Amino acid sequence: MRVLVTGATGFTGGHLARALAAKGDEVTALVREKAAEQDGVRVIHGDLRDPAALAAATAGIEIVYNIAAIYRQAGTATETYRAVNAVAVRDLIEAAARHGVKRVVHCSTVGVHGDVEHPPASEDAPLKPGDVYQESKLEGERLAREAGQRLGIEVTIARPSGIYGPGDRRLLKLFRGIARRRWITLGDGEIYYHLTYIDDLVAGFRLCGEHTAAANRTYILAGGEVTTLNALVGLVADAAGVPEPVWHLPAWPFWVAGAACEVICAPLGVEPPLFRRRVDFFTKSRAFDISRARAEIGFDPRVSLREGIRKTLDWYRANRWL
């Protein structure tokens, strides 16, 4: 299979590109940064916003996996989020259609559902993004579907939840704080949390790309276990061989402080030392229903939370990230 992976220099895209190459696919990666060809992956340098780069990258491709996105970055303009996470998605699908690509798998996020009031949330749960990043991802979904219907190309939307694993930086602070015995939980810690180990997510992406039933469908891809934040902290502490943290502080003063930091730092284009989104980690439940993906395409996450945490922590230690 001839496949294109965008965002292949990132955590998720990199794992996907290497896995596809390992199983025998001819993998092309469209990347912005200078990167040498490795692990059987052919590299094309370019930007999703560049029509010439899209044309070169999609020529001769059968399946496109669009993993590239701009994540939350201080000082990033709303229009930049929209240009990369929405408009460029449409442009990529149009380029793919012109070159006869069969299917585009677009990586969105469960964040398009916003704060889940009645967990677990399915793909049909209300869509109410809570920030500019989530809004841009939701618009990307809409533009992707519209382009697919207009051009007659198959488009599959994947909404991952809480991605983690070797090489991930987003949960590094959690692991590092617990391993160094400096972790304090804000709130009671009884919110739900739903993580997805990277190997399971990669398997889900492949099913989205290759399974006949996945054409023009939307799937939540998440791990097989839902846990509470307290239980998650306990699992990390156990894997790290340290006592489980017991300190808790009220969350609301930190949320207020985060709001103030955002107001002060945003005009300066610097990342706030504390922001509301970070406090939301402690206060908003995230639990999702993956029964559609299980039933329709055979998605079957196999890495237990305990095993995934151990593998991730071992990698952090081996690479001296902890």
Where on the chain are the PLM-derived regions?
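N-terminal Rossmann NAD(P)H-binding glycine-rich loop of SDR-like oxidoreductase domains
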Residues: 3-23
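NAD(P)H-binding glycine-rich loop region in Rossmannoid oxidoreductase-like domains
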Residues: 35, 45-90, 95, 110-115
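Conserved Rossmann-fold NAD(P)-dependent oxidoreductase catalytic core, especially the SDR/UDP-sugar
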Residues: 91-133
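Flexible, glycine-rich beta-alpha linker
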Residues: 114, 153-172
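Active-site Tyr-X1-5-Lys
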Residues: 130-156
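Substrate-positioning beta->alpha
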Residues: 139, 168-173, 187-209, 216-217, ...
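Mid/C-terminal beta-alpha module of Rossmann-like enzyme folds, strongest
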Residues: 207-274, 290, 306, 310-311
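Amphipathic terminal alpha-helices
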Residues: 292-295, 300, 304-322
